[in-house]
Amino acid sequence: MTRIKLLLISSVVVLAILACALPGDESGTAEEAPPAGDGEVSAPTYTPPAPSGEEGEKNYRTDNILFQDNFSNPDSGWDRQSYNVGSTDYADGGYVISVTAPGQILWANPGQAFKDVSVEVETVWLDGGDDNNLGIICRYQDIENFYALVISSDGYYGIRRALNGNDKISFFGDEGMEESDVINMNGHNQLRADCIGNTLSLYANGELLMQVEDDALAYGDVGLIVGTFSAENTEILFKNFVVYLP
């Protein structure tokens, strides 16, 4: 079962999002840029749980960490903003993005610049409708150019791209978002996004959901994203954000 979802970015949301273009590093290896703003990222004290199964053990890494944030320090550099369509802030032991109108999207970035990365984060549905999308941003250059690897709270997944100021953040593939029983509906999910070379890969709970090839964007910031489709509102908690050098 599939469904098509194309989310328009309204002008009010574009104006509301706090974003900046990062120069990045175009060398063959990932490079970390200093965080934006005056806040310093605190060293997280958590230890990520080891995933179960052969694939999980293979990908469980405690070294090669480029950036991490457990969101215990509200000055670690992520946006703390309220808009007429939602908000982004540290809360509930993590980072919460709340969207309060249908057909809208909000995201946040920590102010980094990387090329090849593997990003992991825990997601928890807190409230609102499940016709949404939530996930990880990579290679974010500005509000017009980035990738978003997302799932929905009703069990769908997809990989999206914003490129050169197009009116829509479109999905790869003709089918839009695909359904998967790997995704825990209206619950907790462990997400992973690999942006390595020209390959973009989305994982949920240790299982590969989707992989696409695209060479449009080679570097940029990472981030978190939440949007609504028909849902009147949705609220997502993110915890334990880690960026690895693949």
What are these regions, as identified by a protein language model?
Residues 187-201:
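Localized edge beta-strand/strand-to-loop motifs within extracellular or lumenal beta-rich domains
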Residues 56, 104-112, 177-183, 227-228:
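Beta-strand-rich interaction surfaces with strong enrichment in secreted/lumenal proteins
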Residues 166-190:
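Short, aromatic/His-centered strand-loop micro-motif at the edge of beta-sheets
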Residues 212-240:
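Flexible glycan-contacting loops in extracellular carbohydrate-active proteins
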Residues 85-105:
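Short carbohydrate-recognition loop motifs
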Residues 48-82, 239:
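Extracellular carbohydrate-recognition regions
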Residues 99-167:
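Secretory/extracellular carbohydrate-interaction modules
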Residues 12-63, 246:
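Ser/Thr-rich, Proline-interspersed low-complexity disordered segments
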